[in-house]
């Protein structure tokens, strides 16, 4: 029987070589896609480096205080700023005799070049000059500065501040972010395969610098899209025979100098817990830890007392655990006050709404997500979360910003038992900040409600919430209310996927 034309075509040996390259291409694409997916999944769930994501012991502490930066307008509309965080940091640096260890996220003057009539404080140079001056005054002083690669645009620019510190003998450690888990697996899975190994150079590029003036390479942009960071803002110094620490929400970044911020200062063994957490960051970045620095905390310094304030150092995901425990543990008769720059973490949003429902007196003060260094924002995620909380009956106000940001990250639980619990530091209430993607540091304080730190925390929140003393700091919910369905959908997608700047 004669064969059909279709059969002849399928068995024609001349067509087989043409099909083989197509099959090879499909196989190569399938293998590449598999490698991409495998890389993405691994870098979301890979083990954390040693010493990351820790909760230190709850230790008795001395000299515990809440320091604040506030910006407000007076009845005539003039803007004022009252700053204490970096004033205290500079004071502590100026008295150090043995060691200074700082970990600072934004440490640059990017964004201040287009300030117009706004006068920013030159925080990046103030901190640089203070560290250099102290190193010169005390040549044997050990000084370590840990920072994020954003300050060099991921290797694409030379940082004049970091260069000045290196020339003065300061050990500068740029964090190796590739060792961390990724919040943006869709991109980072590919970047880990194709681009991480390409490195970068600071000799200039052809693309605009996304953060400031000048040009950078394509590799800077590709690294930026990983969207993770060493977001810590800490300082540990010796003070006499003891150690003192600051855990802050504030960055030494000129264009951030008008932001509202908070910091917890404490002395004693908990400062050495914070120092140990910074040693872990140096280790994951391949940096040697100076021998002059303590590597352990004396066991006898762990003291459980109900009279003195107690401090616990928290990092990364353990901050989330402490926040959830504080909210879930609040009962009728307790008060829960929250002031935060970004609020989008789903478990925490639900926990706050549930606390209000069971009779806790909840108040939430949010940044309207209106401004970012001269650029207008769309209000995501805070306005969408605010609408949800207000619908649940939670009292909520906005920081009444005028170009600056309400950059604090603070939770204050005032218990009916006469004690307060304060959690403050670098971590915004987002998936990226609380779920072991960024490096973060916060301090948890337990104190009697008449302790100085308790009075300071209550005064800070009341002043911001109630606009006392003729200072306009906050505004009613209606001013920035946003019920857009599209932006609500985008917030949910961005929070779940990591494809966002928050």
Where are these regions (language model features)?
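Charged, low-complexity intrinsically disordered terminal segments
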Residues: 2-5, 15-502
